[in-house]
UniProtKB/Swiss-Prot annotation:
Entry keyword Protein biosynthesis: yes
Keywords in alphabetical order: Aminoacyl-tRNA synthetase, ATP-binding, Cytoplasm, Ligase, Nucleotide-binding, Protein biosynthesis
Protein's job: Aspartyl-tRNA synthetase with relaxed tRNA specificity since it is able to aspartylate not only its cognate tRNA(Asp) but also tRNA(Asn). Reaction proceeds in two steps: L-aspartate is first activated by ATP to form Asp-AMP and then transferred to the acceptor end of tRNA(Asp/Asn).
Catalytic activity: tRNA(Asx) + L-aspartate + ATP = L-aspartyl-tRNA(Asx) + AMP + diphosphate
InterPro entries from the UniProt entry: Aa-tRNA-synt_II, aa-tRNA-synth_II, aa-tRNA-synth_II/BPL/LPL, Asp-tRNA-ligase_1, Asp-tRNA-ligase_1_N, Asp/Asn-tRNA-synth_IIb, AspRS_core, GAD-like_sf
Name listed for the protein in its UniProt record: Aspartate--tRNA(Asp/Asn) ligase
Entry binding sites for L-aspartate: 177, 223, 447, 488
EC number: 6.1.1.23
Residues annotated as site: Important for tRNA non-discrimination: 32, 84
Amino acid sequence: MKYRTHKCNELSLNHVGEHVRLSGWVHRYRNHGGVVFIDLRDRFGITQIVCRQEENPELHRLMDQVRSEWVLCVEGLVCARLGGMENPNLVTGSIEVEVSHLEVLSRAQNLPFSISDEHINVNEELRLTYRYLDMRRGDIVDRLMCRHKVMLACRQYLDEQGFTEVVTPVLGKSTPEGARDYLVPSRIYPGNFYALPQSPQLFKQILMVGGLDRYFQIATCFRDEDLRADRQPEFSQIDMEMSFGGPEDLFPIVEELVTRLFAVKGIELSIPFQRMTYQEAKEFYGTDKPDLRFGLRLKNCCEYAKKFSFSIFLDQLAQGGTVKGFCVPGGADISRKQLDVYTDFVKRYGAMGLVWIKNQDGGISSNVAKFASEEVFHEMFEAFEAKDQDILLLIAAPEAIANQSLDHLRRLIAKERQLYDAEQYNFVWITDFPLFAKEEGELCSEHHPFTAPLEEDIPLLDKDPLSVRSSSYDLVLNGYEIASGSQRIHNPDLQNKIFSLLRLSQESVKEKFGFFIDALSFGTPPHLGIALGLDRIMMVLTGAETIREVIAFPKTQKAGDLMMSAPSEILPIQLKELGLKL
């Protein structure tokens, strides 16, 4: 049986007089006194079909029984709609199909929510439980189609650049990469476990050792971590690695790749992208993920804070803290009530309060006006390049707290005051991250333990490891990290040195990474790589509010699958086969 001659978006006045066959879902049903109208929908569009009782009573009776989301196959004659009855909102709005034959392919139960009315706000849990129905509402499938085209563009471009797509194992070894692993028990080796990959990191480096030269993969990765709007327990990344190159070789490739991906949505980007060191990003934006669509740059004002008799300023400076903030152009119109809201807001991030200074008609209005002379305030206005009717917002706190608080505050104010265009795309490379961070008094990797230090900083590994910069880089878009990568360590002695600084014993290294150190010992080319977060890119490209909206079957924020009711208990016999007890 041939189910269709045309899709539901293809018919026009050019087809009038033709007999056609269509298949699809009942989108809307209307009975207008002996005339039944049905909007028949498939993935591509909608066509109105019609049956008149006087012309075909039996068929009219059958169509009158049809309900929403039944699946139909119809045959009929394409006719022009009567004058004034056209629907300009439909591609097929100038025609209708007069049905001569109808077959019900599948019936539908009563729906848990409306498919035809896309404006109804449906609870997300209900949508995820009936994901297959949610897909029929249009947005999800449109985003999946966009994702498909983005993946095609990615594969085509990387193939042009000499990258080979290789699928790496999903069942691997548990290694310390930062987040918790998802573990898979082995039936054949009782008491032993595989780990699902947090990334193909070691495999792709070993591919470089093996001489592949350039690798890529659209990889599924797994991390058992607390979720938020832009995280999922399983996610996709465009994974890349290349030999005999450095960041100056990789950056142009990634920039052109991103340009091709955005071109799928008709978005033109300007390359090369801006660059900024980690230190600059922290100093001027308070974060290593700066949103550059607007100004509100942070400025250190410790030299002016010293001139205040304000104890909070002086105490923080004495304790090694900082005083910094930003200027909001025209912000003198912010009310006291709203400033109180901002004060409560920054307290969420550890700040003790918020200092505000308004430049109004050459005069000073401030909650710390009595603690400094007018001359000091005017010096600060000059330093911040503040004009009349501007406001300075300052925080005195330890550096990390001040940065975090001001980062969130500048984003909030920029959004409230509409300081940027939502359709604006500002990319920036963040480079020269610290190689190490400190956690509970111990060194840990800022990225991962396979990241190479900058060559000029290698002598500092023994003297001052926390000051060592890494040859690593993130690509940030509008405040989102969409890619992260680094030059890799290709010298086994240096790799062992890094493991030693991370307090990994030789026994632990041999157990967890022995195979990898062995691989590095057989002649390893200099290599580097990057991984682009496909889900995050799709979230930005499609304007989705969460990553869940760009994944076909996402998990909830509690890592649950509501449609399949997973995770779920397993049978006692399955536990026994795996040698496990609960």
